[in-house]
Structures are given as C-alpha cells and as structure tokens.
Amino acid sequence: KIKDNKVKYVEGINGPANEGRLCVKGRFGFDYIHHPHRLTKPLIRKEGAPKGLNVDPANPLTHFREASWEEALDRAAGGMRDLKAAHGGQAVAGFGSAKCTNEEAYLFQKLIRQGFGHNNVDHCTRLCHASSVAALMENVGSGAVTATFNQIENADVAIVIGANPTENHPVAATYFKQFTKRGGKLIIMDPRGTAMKRHATHMLQFRPGADVSMLNAIMHVIVEEGLYDQAYIEKFTENWEAEKAHLAAFAPEKMEAICGIPAETLRAVARDFAGAKAGMIFWGMGVSQHIHGTDNSRCLIALALMTGNVGKPGAGLHPLRGQNNVQGASDAGLIPMFLPDYQTVTSDDIRGKFSSVWGSGDWSAEKGLTVTEILDAVHHGDIKGMYILGENPAMSDPDVTHAREALASLEHLVVQDIFLTETANYADLILPAAAFYEKSGTVTNTNRQVQMGRPAVTPPGEAREDWAITVELAGRLGLGWRYASPADVFAEMKLTMKSLDNITWERLEAENAVTYPSLSPSDPGQAIVFADGFPRAEGRARFAPASVISPDETPDADYPMVVTTGRQLEHWHTGSMTRRATVLDAIEPEANCSLHPDTLKDLGVAPGGMVRLETRRGAIIMLARADRAVARDMVFVPFAYVEAAANVLTNPALDPYGKIPEFKFAAVRVTAA
C-alpha cells in the first residue's frame, strides 16, 4: 500500500515461491527506505578528513561535502582512470551486490572486465554459498538448485543440514512444516538446536566441524547394507567405485566419537533416507562456511546421487540461498572465475564470445581474486582503488579489523549505496543509490525463478538507480555503452546466457516470474532438472570422495570454546537496512549472543548480563542470552551489530576450492564483562 510516495504496509502476492506468504522482514521491514539516514546527494570527502568508523550517518557533512552528480561521476571515474594509467588495470577492483538486480550485477562485472582488463570482481556469494557452488559445478555441472524448495511437497524424506529456516528462510520453513504435517520424515542436522527440531523425526546435533565424518558414516551404512540405487548410479554417475572404497573406513561405530552422534542414530537416518521413494537435501551456511565447506557439499551431492535422488519429483539438492538475488547475481557473472551462466573465464572461446557481444578487446584469462583475496591485495599494495556497490565489507568480512585497515589504505574508494554504511565511512566518494522498492529490474531467487521487479515509490532526493550510475561511469571510462533501460541490458544478457532462453522482458512483465530453464515460450519453467542426465562430460554426475579435515583453528587452553556466527529472524546481514526498520529494530535493538544456561552459570553471568568474547583477532563485549539450543562449549553471535561486530572475532582461513572464510568456527575465550 502506497500513500504520498511512502510504503504504508506490504502484503504477499500469490507468487510461485511463496503463494502469498511473507517473512517477518518482508512484512515489517520496509520502512528503512524512508529513514532520514538515506543518502540523497553525491558526497565527496573533505580534504584531510580522516577515514575510519567516525562518521555519524545522520550528519555526514562533518567529513564529506555535497556535490553535483556531474562532479561526483567525473571524480569517481577520473580516479579509476588515473590509477589504471599509473599502475595498470589491476590496480582497480570491484565488489558488487546480491541486493541489486540481475541487470545491475551484469553491468558491474562487465565494467570491471571490459574497463580494467581483469576478473577481480566478486560479491557476497563468496561469504555464503561459494563452496556449495564449487562442489555443484564440479560434480553436477551447474551451480543452481536441482529442484525448487516447493518440491518437498512430493518428498517422503527431507534432510535440512546447517540451516535454520525458521529464522533465515521463513517462507521455505512453512513448506517444511506442511511436509511434516502430512507425514513426511524431516531429518535436522545442526550443531545448534533449531526451531525446526520440533517437527523433526531425527535431530542430529553433531559436533561443530564434524559434517564430513557424520555424512560419510551415513553413506557407509547405505553401501554396507546395499541400500544404494545401482541402476541410477550406472546410468548417470561416474567414480562410484572410488567413492565406495573411500567410505569403507567410515563405519558409524568409528565416527560416533568424532561427530558426537550415536552409531544407531546414524544407521537409522541412513535407512530412512535411502528407503525414501523421493528424498530432498537442503543446506545452509552451516555447511558452506567452513574451510571444508566444499567437502561438506560433496558429501551431500554424493548422498543424493547414490540414492538416485536427483531429477525426479520430490528429490534433489537445494542450497538455500541467503539473499534475494545472490542466485541471480552469480548467474549474471558477478564472480571472479566465471562469466554469466558460469562460463569459465579461462576459455579463449568463451571470452571471445563475450568480447564480440560487448564490442571490446580481450581481457585476462586468469581467474580473478575473491572478496578476501582482493582486500589482502590491497594490504600488499597491488590494488589501490575500488568501486563498491551495495556491499559492506567493513562489517561482513572475516577478521574485519584487517578489512577496515585495507579500506582505509585505498587511494581511491567509490561507494555506491543507499546509506552511509560502515564501508562508506572509508570512501572518497559516495554515490546515492535507489533501493529495491524504487527501481526496475529482474531478480532470481533460490528456486531459479526469474522475477520482475517494478518501482513502487520514487527514490529520495537525487538518488539514482544503480544500473544508471554504472552506465554513467562506464561512459566516463570510455566504454561507450548505450542502454536506455534495464530491458536493454536484459536483451544483451540473453545473447550469452542460455539459461534465459524463452524468457523475455515482455514475458516477465506479463507473467511476473518464469523459472529457468524454460523449454518453450509458454513453459513456466522446470522445477526439476537433470532427469535425463547432467551438463557434464557424457551426461554423468561425479562422486568426489571427501576426507575429514579439522577446522583451521581448534579450541585450546587459552581459547577453550567455539564461536559461530549467523543471522537472526529480525536482522538482515550487517543491519544497514533492518536496524533502520522501525518494527524490526524495536524487537531486537541490542547486540547479543547466545550461550547454554550451564555455561553462563559457570561464568557467573546471569541471562541478560554482559560477556567478553575474545579470539586471536580481537574482542567484543555484548549482552548474553541463555539458550539450551547452543552446545555448552559454543557461543552463537549474530553479525548485524556494529557496536559489537561479530567479524572482529572470525577466522579468515579459506576453503581451498570455494575460497569461502570459516565464519562458522573459531576458538574463543568467554569471560564475564
């Protein structure tokens, strides 16, 4: 409901993914767009104004001055041009955003590649499901889900591992609950107890970091008892014999001491899943945000393949994506190793195809640097300028003190956002952008559903849509782009992205959403893929045996507990939007962490008291809550609060394949504050 160019309330529409349902953020988290902190004019840092977390977003003119768009764009592009001329294109890198549209993500990666000649462009997928995508690309041949979450309606058994859908995917959680009400078996696996366990047949609260030992033990039982689907394996997979031989060493009786789950429970779960007519596997960042995140995902893929649970109704692999457009931004090429549609940057033929469409010369065949690697390169002096659109690494990156030091050292930082975020505190120029409610463009959700977004209100002040700002910068960088609207960008995307076959702008305007792949102009899209093979050599998916790898940093006498980080129901990622949403911030206004009641008692801290959390990277102080869902040797910390930033604590160690940091495990010392 819109009145006087303001959103008054929000109702769910009958879309293919939600059928009228909304999560708490969608229903109550909309008024941030009208917050007085909104950026409305371009800002340029005043001469000598120090960089750091020292700017009041309500009064940015202490450190910045207002500028015209002409001056700001000239300076933004000019600074990038100067760095390229002095040091080469590698001196400038970019972070895009999963909060932007597909068209904006596409233009952003194109600007970095075409304008600076390299692939050092990334976004927050590196911090959430990069390891999942690495495993899926390696073994299935596609980085998207094989079945929509709605397909749980056709399943007998479903596994949800490393995810807390009640808080982080509330709409999907309603389908999971419906599934159990009609008799479906729900298996929850998580080091934290979650609200979904009330609906579960089995709750496996395993030891943090022990995913591979637990999953391999389950698969060992399936092999040992002959419960695997031999016909499916022979027809659609490869490397089965190696997988089978590898699993021989993972008997549940050996693994129970490692993962903390009794052997009989592991055997029961194996029998339930293997015995299902159709089984689905859902996972979240509890699986992916480890140095062994790719191995965790390889295990889940292997479990689905050996039981024949891909490519049929009620079966499949579904990494629950964490942002409204992290799927779409990844599809659009906003990642350093792939061009749009996951086409590798290392192929001369593929780059040649894009060069032809773009009307430009070739660029580097090297895979680019990822989010954390880019900031490391800033520290080393190799990258001297950045263009950051809708991303907040000063809050979201691991070992965030290191990230902030990198941002402060940049010679030229352009930040494009809707608020003066923590990252914008380090900017030389700030460009005011339109929020999602204020722009046109498509987004692609976790279900592979491409959806049309339309503006409900106009942007405040002089704020502009992100795609239009990027096009203006490209012009000043000499790229000669000609786009009159997001529809023009979408038309270009279709020239190189087969996933968009049979999906047109006009069709999306008429139908609102189409799932890819769509096999004809009238096909609403395929909810299930790979029924007749996989987009790999000879149409076969691959088994990739995974070994047990310890977390990078394990508890010891100095740091005897484990800290894990994540989201809350009320707050979204770094909090820049939801902490400015009236209802959501009123419900959850204060930085907090969760510990087991016995742990608090041992610390001499009452629930609601303050604790100090310290790792090898830094310390924070925050309010402590009692939560029996948290293991006695664990503390859970949400990462939305700048006053007690969880990522001061986190470990920047990376998964070697997905290059994702280990947000879910670090050794910590907890004391009364």
List PLM regions with ranges.
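N-terminal leader/propeptide and maturation segments of large enzyme subunits in energy/redox metabolism
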Residues: 45-66, 227-263, 340-353, 358-362, ...
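Long, contiguous, secondary-structure-rich segments that constitute the structural scaffold
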Residues: 460-514, 519, 574, 579-594, ...
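Glycine/threonine-rich flexible loop motifs
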Residues: 165-174, 392-402, 441-444
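Flexible glycine/proline-rich, aromatic-decorated loop/lid segments
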Residues: 192-195, 418-455
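Long, low-complexity segments enriched in small/aliphatic residues
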Residues: 327-335, 486-583
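Conserved short loop/turn motifs at secondary-structure junctions
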Residues: 93-101, 258-261, 284-291, 323, ...
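N-terminal export/assembly segments and adjacent metallocofactor-ligating motifs
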Residues: 1-227, 235, 239-242, 254, ...
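A glycine-rich, hydrophobic/aromatic-adjacent loop/helix-cap motif
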Residues: 274-376, 477, 521-523, 532-536, ...
